[in-house]
Amino acid sequence: MTQMTEKKKPLIILTGPTAVGKTAASIGLAKAIGGEIISADSIQVYRHMDIGSAKILPEEMKGVKHYLIDVLNPEEEFNVAVFQKMAKDAMVEIYKRGRIPIVVGGTGFYIQALLYDIDFEKGEENTAYRKKLETYAKEHGAQALHDRLREADPKSADAIHANNVKRVIRALEYYHETGTKISEHNEAEREKDSPYQFAYFVLNDVRSRLYERIDRRVDIMVEQGLVDEVTALKTRGCTREMVSMQGLGYKEILDYLDGKNSLEEAVTILKRDTRHFAKRQLTWFRRERDVNWIQKEEFGYDEEKILQAMLAILKEKEITD
């Protein structure tokens, strides 16, 4: 009975496709409610990776405390389990100060893992089997490995991009160890109720405008020195096998530096791949439950009106007074 009456802790999610304008919206929201921001971005967590990840600048934070930005070196591993633990630790601190955590970023799987407290690591890790799969990927290519996943677990194959070799291996490993599909396990976990009193905002824009913003953002990154940033990482000893270097903007420029493409080709590929990524992000968010879509064009792109709409929803959900 106590559990029924115990008030859940508040949690706000602010997500959306890449380049939609989450950063500016999140600062406005945090200032308005006294919130603190946890980044749900798989690359901004790394030091020395600023331009390619469109990392928020200290002056853009406007005094709002941020977590999970610049906390790992590029050589370190970062995955959904590490994110979940770090984010939970940050939330303990935020609640202690009587503040509300706002999770901001476009990595839907990370957000889902935190929001529903997903236990996705039940399968025991089998290093020998993983090594076998890694060797297979090196010899036959990422696509051939992905085809094996499609045979074992078609739903996971739809959700995981062929180039994301680590996640493909994890899904195959899970199937090998447990005899069940990781997609079915995750589906069951997703059906759980969230332990939080939450609002899940997805900021979105009309496709043509979003794609224009993506193209412009890539051009700005190149102007700001993306090539120099990737060169410095390469000099540091970072390789394409590292999780950090598989991020958009890094692998494409690495190909250019390795003489596989011209800079012009690398930029074209980066724009195309970022648009595809935005499309996949939106597909993911459409599958999620209890989502509040914030269509920017419906508010005439007025940031104040967008903020007021979010504040009204927070009040309605009794997350704020």
Language-model segments: which ranges?
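Phosphate/pyrophosphate-binding catalytic cores of soluble transferases and nucleic-acid-acting enzymes
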Residues: M1-D321
